Amino acid sequence: MKKIMLVFGTRPEAIKMCPLVNELKTRKGIETIVCVTGKHRQMLDQVLEAFQVEPDYDLSIMKDRQTLFDVTTNILNRIKAVLEEVQPDVVLVHGDTSTTFVTALACFYLQIPVGHVEAGLRTYNIYSPYPEEFNRQAVSIISAYNFAPTELSKENLLREGKNPDTIYVTGNTAIDALKTTVREDYTHPDLEWAKGSRLIMITAHRRENLGEPMKHMFRAIRRVCDEHPDIKAIYPIHMNPVVREIADSILGDDERIRIIEPLDVLDFHNFLSRSYLILTDSGGIQEEAPSLGKPVLVMRDTTERPEGIKAGTLKLVGTDEEVIYQNFKQLLEDEEAYRAMSTASNPYGDGFACKRIADILEGKA
């Protein structure tokens, strides 16, 4: 029996790893162990419940206003005992979080093979996104299995000198998750509030956007909403108190913008599927929305997902207020521009990434 341990801590990681947990649990020759760090406790629990995943270990590192130093040292100090107790054959981590980096580092110290899900994404600017770009590059040095979501991600890894025999193009597990969560008969009170209007979904939380960039983003969104009475915007706000303070000060009193608590993954994916367009600084939404045929304006200066830009499903608009305003306004007023983005092809997979990863691990772990 092969022991495969999956470690994750944030909501976006959980959305992409829980389908893989459930796929691995169907394999008779694999013992699946789940460890969560609890970095975003409330938001993480929502996803675990939606996918009916019960962690075997919980490091419970969550505390208010913790720094990267706190997160790094807490995970490193606590994951060691779990790894030594479980003695897994392979540890799977996802993407670019601090949990991913620190877990991979601990595995390196203990000489445990690491499988990197969503490997090979790059901006090649270690401060954008921060600290994610450094995290994922560092994990690629350590990883024995590199599960790249696209051919471009594979090419990035090859350019960096990774052994081709360790790289597998699987598609993105985010697309697998949508098969479970999006439902035709879904209803929600906030969707009833937006009924009859074009629904705009907003997400914004990135560390590098805190402060003035986020203020610019929210001012642009408010201007457009105030000028277009036929739209309503919903913003499931992040738990970060700094984000909440900025959002409340700029968007809080606008009758066409509803700030709500974080949605669980089932709710969130169904909100996305019923939206007209999406403004975000998230990484995962850049993959999920194109699968649903929704245009995405990416409020970041860089993206590690250029496939979506190239395909035309995403547009990188940065954090400048006027640029966001003009692009948001165009998609509301220019039907051809909207149609071009909403009908572009999805470059992120077919919904069978988890099966491919499990097949590889079953044969090679």
Predicted regions and their residues:
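Nucleotide-activated sugar donor-binding and catalytic core shared by glycosyltransferases
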Residues: 1-235, 240-365
